[in-house]
Every structure is written in C-alpha cells, then in structure tokens.
Amino acid sequence: SGSGVRSAKKGGKAQGGQAGVGYKGSTEPG
C-alpha cells in the first residue's frame, strides 16, 4: 500500500524501482 518510499519506512520493499509501487511488510501489494 502507498508509495515504495512510504512502505519502505514501514518495513516493506519498493518493487521494480518505481515510486508508488511498494509492498507493506513485503506481503501487501501497493
């Protein structure tokens, strides 16, 4: 959920190097 940067701050991972595409906890498609 959210941007890759925001999810990264929540322990997630930015996917594809694209801002706005991230994963919260590496499990929730953002």
Curated annotation (Swiss-Prot):
Composition skew (Gly residues), residue ranges: 13-23
GO biological process: photosynthesis
Location(s) in or outside the cell: Plastid, Chloroplast
Alphabetical UniProt keywords: Chloroplast, Electron transport, Photosynthesis, Plastid, Transport
Highest rank taxon of the organism: Eukaryota
Disordered, as annotated region: 1-30
Protein name: Cytochrome b6/f complex 12.6 kDa peptide
Organism annotation: Euglena gracilis
